[in-house]
Amino acid sequence: NPAFEVKAGTGTDRYTSKMETPQTYAFVGFFAEMPYTAKNRLLASVSAQILSKRLLDKVREEMGATYSISASGQMSRLGKLNTTFQTAFPMKPEMKDEVLAAIKELTTTMKENVTEAELKPVVEFMVKQTGEDLKDNSSWAGAMAASTLNGVTTFINNNEILGTITVTDVQKFISDVLAQNNYRVIVLDPDGDVQEAAK
C-alpha cells in the first residue's frame, strides 16, 4: 500500500511544541531500494551497529548532547524502499544543528572509512546471536514463514555469510544506500516561549 511507504527524497521537516522540559527531539532516517538477499539483510544490521557505536562515541560521549542514542538498520521483504536506517533521540536544543551535522558526517563517511576494529566485534556478536536463535523454535518458525513471502532463505546460513563480510562490503552497501538520496530529518523543537524561559 503506497500510503504506508516511506516518503522518498531528501529534506528536513521542523515542528514545535510546548514542553515543560525543553528538549529537541530528532529523527534521522535514510532509505533505499536494495536487492533482498541474505547477505544484504545482514549488511543492513552490521552497518547499523557500526553506526550506533559511532553515534554513541561522538554525540553522547564527546559532545554530551544526549543521554542515549543508537541506530537501527533493516531490510523488508516487501515494499519499494525496503532498506531502512534510522535513529531517534532527544537532545539539548542549543546543540541540534551541530549534532545533526555530526550525524550526517558519521553516516556519509562510512562509505570510505569503516575499520576492521569496528566490524569484528559486530560480526562476533551476530554469530553468537545466530547460534542462540538456531536453538529457538520460534526463530525457526518465523524464518520459515517469512521465506514464503519472497523465497529468500535468511536464517540457516547466516553464520556462513557473516564470515564472508568485509569492510569493503559494508562501505559499498552504505554507499549504494546513500546514493539513492533518501535522507530525511524530522525535528521537534520546544516552542519559542518555553525555549526562552529555559535560558
Please give the residue ranges for each predicted region.
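Glycine-rich, charged/polar anion/phosphate-binding loops
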Residues: 10-15, 70-74, 170-171
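Long, His/Glu/Asp-enriched segments that create or flank divalent metal/ion-associated functional microenvironments
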Residues: 57
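Bilobed periplasmic-binding protein-like "clamshell/Venus-flytrap" ligand-binding domains
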Residues: 171-189
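M16 family metallopeptidases and their MPP-like homologs
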Residues: 23-35, 60-112, 116-164, 184-189, ...
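His/Glu-based metal-binding/catalytic segments typifying zinc-dependent metallopeptidases
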Residues: 1-54
